[in-house]
C-alpha cells in the first residue's frame, strides 16, 4: 500500500503551487486528513467552513473515502449559512457526478470515491479544485451574515 501521508503531502504542495492559491487560502494537513479553506471562513480551529478529505483506517477497510464541504460550529449563523449557500449552489453541486447535497447538521455536500492508489493524488486534486469553484458563493453568503 502506498504511503497515504506522502500522497497528502504532495497534494498540499501542489495546491500551494496552484495559480489560484494566494495568501488567504489555508491548508490544514494532519497526515491522512486535509482541510482547504480561506482565512475569512472562520476555520482557524478547523471548525468553520472548509473542504475536507481523509483516508484513515475505516476508509482503507471500506476501500472508499469522502471529499466533502462542511460548515461547522464556528461558522456564523451555521444553519442559515447552509440554507442560503444551498439556495445558490445546490443545482451546481447536484450536476457534479457522484455528489450528494446533504444540508443537514454541518454537512453541505459529499462525494464518496473508491480508494484506488493508482490515481489518488490526481483524484484528490481534481475534487478539491472542483469544490474550490464554490469559493465566491461561500464568501458572498458569509459577508451577508456578518454585516
Predicted regions and their residues:
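Charge-biased C-terminal accessory regions appended to nucleic-acid-, cytoskeletal NTPase
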Residues: 83-147
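Polyanion-binding interface signature
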Residues: 1-112
